[in-house]
Structures are given as structure tokens and as C-alpha cells.
């Protein structure tokens, strides 16, 4: 009988952030396929787990998957882990999972830590729906396409960025979509955890960029393409400004400017809507 491929989420920083079930699976499987066996060794040692490991990263996944599938076909259970968080989310593992599915092997998720959801939950920005965009490309042509895609999004987006590119990326985001509300997380769950909230311009002033991968949550405005957009009512504008001032901590003036840009209105038009709502008692 074939074994099972377990997709195991591991801590994104604090080694205590791992489920009892994940620890049991890591102890019981025959082999752990790890993005970096050295980093995984620290986690296993912390929890006294002696299961053998093998490397599975972006440079060897295509060639290594076949041998792992053979072990699974032979009845071995295998756990897939990344350096941090949930495998395949901007991490290796997708090829192995697809190969296992094609081979009729059971793939079972073991949920747990996620930098995406951790940053989103603590951001104070709307979370009912969001778009995850991974890492912005590094090549100029690809970055241009990536930012053009972001500009067409209306709502909350989450993406990762490296420390040596975070300021460049946030400045480019500001030029593309305006000074939108953001929450920028660094070293989440670690000793030097930092989560900076506010408009991009203010967040950049307080941002430390010395180390640690960044997780960015941003509330992007309406699409600026030629599609028809229904103008929001005065009540909707007032409610939107209220959410920004209450949850993100923006001043009323900044919230008005952001809402105006988002909906293609003048700040005076939005201000008048707020004043009209006050007078009518809405």
C-alpha cells in the first residue's frame, strides 16, 4: 500500500509555534523532505525528533521528486517541510505534490503557521478577501508588469520582499497606487518582531531594513483602467473613511485623500460628503 505525503507547516520564527499533530507526523514518517536540512535540524533537535531528512529545494526538486515518489509507492510516509511556514507558498514542493497526485498517492495537509495570515490578521486592514502576490520580480520588465497588475486590484494584497529591496519596492508601490494604507511585518514571531502600520510614506520613515524577510499587507484602490466604476454613495464614503481612521489610525485628512484617489474623486468631493453626512446625522 502506498505511503502518504504530508505537507507540514512549520514555525515562521518562534520554534514553539508548531502543532502537536505536526510534531507527531514528523516523528512517525520515514523521511522528511526539507528545503534546507540544516534549518530543519534546529527544529527537530528542539523537539527531540530523530527522523532522517533529505534536501528538496528549487534547484533539485525536479530531479529529486522521482526518487521520493518511489519511496512513497513502496509504502514509506514522507513529510514535506519548507524553511518556514507552509510548503509551496512561495517555497518549493509544488512539483513533488503534483507528481504524487499524478501517481495516485495521498497528499495530506498538516496546517499551521503562515506569514501571510499572521501579517494579515494583525494588519488592521480588510481581511474578508485578499490577493497573495508572492515576491515581486527582480527583472525590470517583469517588475513593471507586476506593478501594473497590482494597480488593477481593488482590495487587500499581501506579498513578500527581501530586506535589500523593501524600500525600493514600497516607493515604487507608492508611485503606482498612491500613499495607500499598509502594514509591513518584519521578523514576525521572532524576538525583534516589527509591524509598522500607516500610509506608505509614514511606514517607510519608521521601517528598519537591516535584516529579515518582510511581509507586506496593502489596501489597494479601485482599478484605474477604462472599465466602468459605480461611484460610491456619500454613506459608503463616510463608512470607508471611518474604517480607515479607526482600524489603521490614519488622520481624517489622509483618509479622505486616499479614498478620493481610490474612487477617482477630488478630495473636496469626499470632504463635502463627510460634512453632508454630519449635517444629516448619518
Residue ranges and their predicted role:
Residues 95-153:
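Class I SAM-dependent methyltransferase SAM-binding "motif I" and its flanking Rossmann-like core
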Residues 34, 109-112, 159, 184:
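General beta-strand structural signal in soluble alpha/beta enzymes
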Residues 92-94, 252:
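Glycine-centered tight-turn and secondary-structure capping sites
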Residues 2, 77, 156, 163-282:
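A contiguous loop/helix-start segment that scaffolds small-molecule binding in enzyme catalytic cores
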Residues 55-63, 136-139:
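Conserved helicase motor
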Residues 25-32, 104-108, 156-157:
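Short active-site oxyanion
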Residues 1-59:
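Glycine-rich, flexible N-terminal cofactor/catalytic loop recognition
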Amino acid at each position: 500500500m502506498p505511503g502518504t505525503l504530508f505537507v507540514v507547516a512549520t514555525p515562521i520564527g518562534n520554534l514553539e509555534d508548531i502543532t502537536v499533530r505536526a510534531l507527531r507526523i514528523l516523528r512517525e514518517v520515514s523521511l522528511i523532505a526539507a528545503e534546507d536540512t540544516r534549518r530543519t535540524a534546529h527544529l527537530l533537535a528542539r523537539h527531540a525528533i530523530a527522523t532522517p531528512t533529505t534536501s528538496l529545494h528549487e534547484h533539485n526538486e525536479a530531479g529529486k521528486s522521482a526518487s521520493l515518489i518511489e519511496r512513497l509507492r513502496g509504502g514509506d510516509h514522507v513529510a514535506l517541510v519548507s524553511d518556514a511556514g507552509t510548503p509551496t507558498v512561495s517555497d518549493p514542493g509544488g512539483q513533488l505534490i503534483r507528481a504524487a497526485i499524478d501517481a495516485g498517492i495521498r497528499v495530506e495537509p498538516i496546517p499551521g503557521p503562515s506569514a501571510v495570515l499572521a501579517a494579515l490578521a494583525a494588519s488592521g486592514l480588510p481581511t474578508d478577501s485578499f490577493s497573495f502576490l508572492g515576491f515581486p520580480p527582480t527583472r525590470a520588465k517583469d517588475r513593471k508588469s507586476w506593478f501594473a497588475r497590482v494597480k488593477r486590484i481593488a482590495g487587500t494584497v499581501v506579498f513578500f520582499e527581501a530586506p535589500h529591496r523593501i524600500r525600493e519596492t514600497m516607493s515604487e508601490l507608492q508611485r503606482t497606487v498612491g500613499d495607500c494604507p499598509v502594514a509591513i511585518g518584519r521578523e514576525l514571531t521572532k524576538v525583534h518582531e516589527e509591524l509598522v502600520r500607516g500610509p506608505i510614506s509614514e511606514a517607510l520613515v519608521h521601517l528598519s531594513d537591516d535584516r529579515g524577510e518582510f511581509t507586506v499587507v496593502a489596501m489597494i484602490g479601485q482599478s484605474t483602467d477604462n472599465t466602468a466604476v459605480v461611484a460610491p454613495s456619500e454613506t459608503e464614503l463616510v463608512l470607508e473613511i471611518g474604517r480607515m481612521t479607526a482600524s489603521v489610525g490614519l488622520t481624517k485628512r489622509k483618509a479622505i485623500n486616499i479614498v478620493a484617489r481610490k474612487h477617482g474623486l477630488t478630495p473636496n468631493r469626499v470632504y463635502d460628503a463627510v460634512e453632508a453626512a454630519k449635517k444629516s446625522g448619518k
